Amino acid sequence: MEFNHKSVMLYEAVESLNIKPGGIYVDATAGGGGHSFEIARRLHEAESSSAEADIFEKSDAADAFDKRNTHSGKLICLDRDPDAVQAARKRLETFSNATVINVNYSQIDEAVKQLNIDEVDGVLMDLGVSSFQLDEAERGFSYHADAPLDMRMDKQGKSAADIVNNCSEQEIADMLYKYADEKYGRRIAFDIVKARQEMKIETTGQLSDIIASAVPAAYRKNHHPARKTFQAIRIAVNEELYHLETGLAKAFELLKSGGRLSVITFHSIEDRIVKQYFASLCQGCTCPKDFPVCVCKNTPKGRLLYKKPLIPAKEETESNNRSRSAKLRTIIKL
């Protein structure tokens, strides 16, 4: 199965990690291996350049040449999607220092410890759904095709159909508000419950039609009316925000001093979580201003690489419209 996906902000993301010889890096959301490949390539390039320099600096050229062919740097790639793991392994097969593991990035600490690694130099998280997952109709992520209503990244747990057919009207409305800021959430939830009383909702086409009929005609002009609802259900199915909050904390904990955590977000809800978490790590004393001395003992644990998030270049958004909402944030551990 061909895993076609164009990595968003490829060079900006990899550049933010500051790849260095002998470094240990984690691509926590490997997908088809686009970012992973570039990290592995730069790691190989950095180590080769370092070894070349040794040849000229050291009298024992043979020893330096041996070091050039022994790569101490490592790349660990994680993904919860078995199809993505298979694609990443194929993409990275030429890099002996790359390891691909089928696991959710919220378990990054366990995955790294399995390899007897205690700390890393950098972690990258790309929170977007891959083009492969969106375009492969049978995965049930897309509202552009009629397919089984699934949306599971790893084929475990409840599917989108389970949620749509079993959650109460209030639960569905709350989900649409919390995970997508859908202003017509109550209308949509009402119509979903009404429709499922007549026939079980089993396909993306059914759900998309129900949503389209629930919202005003004006709402259907600029964007597909099902866009936000599908986002909210996908987030709920895969417990994305729980995994994000857990993964962020574990990834930062794994970093060496000077290590970097870079995260690419695609919607305001996940970006808010990343922004607030990074801000909490950068915060120093929280004592009231009128306290003569600090009693909280709180010191900053990190600093932002950029004050504001990076966004894709115009050329990228024009060639890949799925990159339009992307934001890249990076924090450096102190």
Predicted regions and their residues:
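S-adenosyl-L-methionine-dependent methyltransferase catalytic core, i.e., the SAM/SAH-binding region
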Residues: 1-334
